[in-house]
Swiss-Prot record:
PROSITE patterns registered for this protein in UniProt: SAM_MT_RNA_M5U, TRAM, TRMA_1, TRMA_2
Gene3D superfamilies in the record: 2.40.50.1070, Nucleic acid-binding proteins, Vaccinia Virus protein VP39
Record keyword Lyase present: no
EC top class named in words: transferase
BP GO terms, sorted: rRNA base methylation
The protein's name: 23S rRNA (uracil(1939)-C(5))-methyltransferase RlmD
Short name of one Pfam family: tRNA_U5-meth_tr
Binding site for [4Fe-4S] cluster: C83, C89, C92, C171
Catalytic activity: uridine(1939) in 23S rRNA + S-adenosyl-L-methionine = 5-methyluridine(1939) in 23S rRNA + S-adenosyl-L-homocysteine + H(+)
InterPro entries: 23S_rRNA_MeTrfase_RlmD, MeTrfase_TrmA_AS, MeTrfase_TrmA_CS, NA-bd_OB-fold, SAM-dependent_MTases_sf, TRAM_dom, U5_MeTrfase_fam
PANTHER family xref list: 23S RRNA (URACIL(1939)-C(5))-METHYLTRANSFERASE RLMD, RNA M5U METHYLTRANSFERASE
């Protein structure tokens, strides 16, 4: 069972004590939990069942933190991290735990959170939606850091709890074609005369090819652009430059926009560098299919999709004839969603830009809502759920990337006359403590 604690502000005391502790469980962020002097001790990198030597680094009234020094007795679920950058990079924090144990822990965390904070039983716990444990990310944003002394630009990810950039040669969770680009890309960027103007680098694997987006703070020279085009042609990628106003310049590819599709591209979603997409293509397909199955929208029903983005759920929900209303807080994604619907030949889908923290029941375009789907950011949809009683959808699917927000919002939903019928883990981010989930609520009676 996962444990959850809310730390209250208190003055920290730095300690140097070295202790031998027995780890009993993991917390919801993947840290090992032990006990000492009546306090909970959090130990990053430690696993349940292990005996470890640690050094206390922080102590507060009810808990302490410790640095892992040595594993005296290892868990049978401990594995060697695949990534050579694991001990420095802040991207993956559970590579040392067997993948089956990772998923079991996440599922337990999800159910425990909902049971505890929503004060309800989780209903039917569905099978975990999962796919490959490695090389699953179709998109990643790499950081850059320019060393003024050496004139070298580093390309990599941020270190854990730090702004430092860990220079990498590969990434074990990034799609293999994208991971393979990193060494040559880093070398090429260091050849640019304008490398000091480079910001982050976004790598994307779309259904129509691989894309490299370079954020630049000022224009690059024609010579630098020629080097980038040479790199693009050699590696068969499309390279774009993105300025501070998020405007993109294609250096090759004739303005081609990345896309991904469903159902053999009968439904196709184009997206831009600034648009949000789910990074795990295979799990996203399974998640969308499950959402459509759970809601089973009929041709005479109206479905409301809040936080709809570019139409990831809206378009598949409309495929069998239901009328779908997608609402999004970012105007650019609303415009892209409308284009995607038109290109997919779906004329019963409409998209609107709105403040999702406001009461949408008064919007003239809303009307009757038979069923509903929400897919909010980590902050959840607490404000949006306040008007649920006015809309009264028969069924609601909540897609969550933060189990704490889901648990909090579930309490609001239940108080408005709904019951939790199904819940399930969506393992969108293997090798990390992050978890996606889905819950189905149905109106009572």
């Amino acid at each position: 069972m996962a444990q959850f604690f809310k730390a209250k502000p208190n003055t920290s005391k730095q300690l140097s004590s070295k202790l031998s502790l027995k780890v009993t469980q993991l917390d919801h962020l993947g840290a090992g939990i032990a006990h000492h002097d009546g306090k909970i001790v959090f130990i990053n990198g430690a696993l349940p069942g292990e005996t470890v030597s640690v050094q206390l680094t922080e102590q507060k009234k009810k808990f302490a933190r410790a640095k892992l020094l040595k594993i005296d007795k290892a868990s049978a679920q401990r594995v060697s991290p695949l990534c050579p950058h694991f001990d420095k990079c802040g991207g993956c924090d559970l590579q040392h735990l067997d993948i089956d144990a990772q998923r079991k822990h996440k599922a337990s965390t999800l159910v425990d959170l909902v049971n505890k904070f929503a004060q309800t039983q989780a209903g039917e716990v569905c099978d975990t939606l999962s796919d490959n444990a490695w090389h699953y990310r179709r998109r990643a944003r790499l950081a850059t850091w320019f060393d003024k002394n050496t004139k070298h630009i580093s390309l990599g990810f941020r270190a854990s709890s730090s702004s430092d950039v860990v220079e990498i040669q590969s990434c074990a969770v990034l799609a293999e074609p994208l991971s393979a680009l990193i060494p040559d890309l880093a070398f090429m960027l260091n050849q640019l005369s304008g490398k000091k103007a480079l910001g982050h680098v976004e790598l994307t694997q779309a259904d129509n090819g691989n894309f490299v987006v370079l954020r630049v703070t000022k224009a690059l020279s024609d010579k630098d652009k020629a080097r980038l085009v040479e790199f693009a042609n050699k590696h068969q990628v499309i390279v774009l430059l993105q300025d501070d106003d998020a405007q993109c310049e294609h250096l090759n590819g004739a303005g081609e926009q990345p896309y991904y599709g469903f159902d053999d591209n009968q439904v196709k979603l184009n997206f831009s560098p600034g648009n949000f997409i789910q990074v795990n293509a295979q799990v996203n397909q399974a998640m969308v299919s499950q959402a459509v199955e759970w809601l089973s929208p009929k041709a005479d029903e109206r479905v409301l999709d809040l936080f709809c983005g570019i139409g990831n759920f809206s378009l598949p929900l409309a495929k069998d004839g239901a009328e779908v209303i997608g609402v999004e807080g970012v105007q650019a994604m609303v415009e892209q969603a409308r284009i995607n619907a038109k290109q997919s030949g779906l004329d019963k889908v409409s998209f609107y830009h709105a403040d999702l923290s406001a009461d949408l029941s008064k919007e003239p375009w809303l009307g009757k809502v038979d069923k509903m789907l929400i897919d909010p950011a980590r902050a959840g949809a607490y404000e949006s759920m306040q008007s649920l009683k006015k809309l009264k959808p028969k069924a609601l699917v909540y897609v969550s990337c933060n189990p704490a927000s889901l648990a909090r919002d579930s309490e609001v939903i239940l108080k408005q006359g709904y019951q939790l019928k199904k819940i399930g883990l969506v393992d969108m981010f293997p090798q990390t403590h992050h978890l996606e989930s889905m819950a189905l609520f149905e109106l009572k009676n």
